[in-house]
Amino acid sequence: MRVGIIGAGSIGLLFAAYLSRVFDVTVYTRSQEQSAEINQHNVLLQSGTEETIAKVKALPIADWQGSEALTIIAVKQYQLFSIIERLSQLPSMPENILFLQNGMGHLKLLDGINTNNLFVGSVEHGALKENPYTVRHNGIGTTNVAVYKGDPGFLKMFVSSVSNVFPITYQEEYFAMMEKKLIANAMINPLTAILQVNNGALIDNPFYYKVLQNLFSEITAILNLEHPEEYWEHVIKICKKTRDNRSSMLKDIEAKRLTEVDAILGYLLEEANKQGKKFPQLETLYYLIKGIESQGVVI
């Protein structure tokens, strides 16, 4: 089966490296230079002390025709607008599309896509792009996937096909799955980005831990969570499991890139606004990240 991956950042390269063990994978890059590098070197996957080379074809995004059986969209949420516009210009709409963005702000964009099967996923792996063709897998987790619209048959087949090489878990209900990841993103990403610390510091430092608790109280109120303890335990588990990792938002800030704060905290603040309520700690974090972004972001 042919799989196309749109985006060659850390997650795009990680998926390309593992899925190439089962499928014929083409990764579509933003620049001609990166696709040339991948075609010359293939994708180098680093995991622990091991290095493996994955045979992957690369093309610039301008050459994307959407002809693969599965298309995986692995770009940042704020880059989706141009990708969705490109979708409408393809000779034929891809039949199966999997979106792998953080937050939930992008879900409203999916309703305008006219295709048979739309899937969404939440990635719990830690990955770092070392150079245009090298990715380090520094936190092994899973990828949860669910049907946003369409038939689950194809997605279940895909999950079973890769289960021996890359952990992907099928979930029955997309909203609960995305909400769980949103909560973790909203608590871990902004704090680590502002404090410039690894994930584990949020639970190791008692003062940071208190801020984490306060944030969770606000998020619980916005989302009206029925069993908040389950979500809290999930966040703590992630902090423990990825204690030495730097969050994606922190890495974006360090690289002077735009973050996905609008898809994460922006989404929560929109929900709060619908309720006519103010949540000052979340709002403060949102404006702090936007302020950092405004200081000379390079996209």
Where are these regions (language model features)?
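NAD(P)-dependent Rossmann-like dehydrogenase/reductase catalytic/cofactor-binding core
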Residues: 213-299
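NAD(P)+-binding Rossmann beta1-loop-alpha1 motif at the extreme N-terminus of oxidoreductases
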Residues: 1-53
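Active-site-proximal catalytic alpha-helix in oxidoreductases
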Residues: 175-203, 207-220
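Short, well-ordered alpha-helices that flank and scaffold nucleotide-derived cofactor binding pockets
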Residues: 17-21, 85-89, 108-112, 266, ...
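Rossmann-fold dinucleotide-binding core
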Residues: 100-177
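Helix-loop-beta segment of a Rossmann-like dinucleotide-binding subdomain
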Residues: 134-144, 196-202, 245-255
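Hydrophobic anchor at the start of a short beta-strand
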Residues: 3, 25-26, 97, 118, ...
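Rossmann-like NAD(P)(H) cofactor-binding subdomain of soluble oxidoreductases
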Residues: 46-134
